[in-house]
């Protein structure tokens, strides 16, 4: 994806620091204080232009959401949604999510969303995929005991790789669809990419997974 440079983006982000948290590491262990309640916290890694996380926050006021996106020129579009209509249960982070433990403590997060992540198709780039084992370990470090990962993509190869990676890590699948839009799954909120790809006839794949809490018998 080629990103369009937006020279105003950084100034906009600095101006609205109540929405885009510039120092997330300082809130490590204290995100509930920042939100002002003890509601569950869900994060989206690679939030892009923010439609998904914004609509989720709007639909679920009793859940706090944090959208994490490293590209300034992209996250500013998510910020514009909050400027137009503020949601008290949504914050944004303009940082790389390579190590979430810098931002969150163990058990601070209830769910991780991964939507249409970069597939990094070349084998030598496998470690960059957000479902590679080091990332799975990273999510495990910040999730509650029964926390979940919800993963969605139109890329069959990435989906198959992710299922294998999660299984090898010892995760348990609680939901799996090989054609989400033609399933009986309810409550799906589409991302910008999802709408684009599905309109072209692409299948949408989805899996929900938990970390195994007991040893295999």
From Swiss-Prot:
Binding site for S-adenosyl-L-methionine: 44, 69, 96, 118
Residues given in the record as substrate binding sites: 122, 154, 191-194
Residues forming the catalytic site: 118
GO cellular component: tRNA methyltransferase complex
Keyword Ribosomal protein among record annotations: no
Reactions accelerated catalytically: guanosine(46) in tRNA + S-adenosyl-L-methionine = N(7)-methylguanosine(46) in tRNA + S-adenosyl-L-homocysteine
Protein name: tRNA (guanine-N(7)-)-methyltransferase
Organism: Bacillus cytotoxicus (strain DSM 22905 / CIP 110041 / 391-98 / NVH 391-98)
Upper taxonomic lineage: Bacteria, Bacillati, Bacillota, Bacilli, Bacillales
Gene: trmB
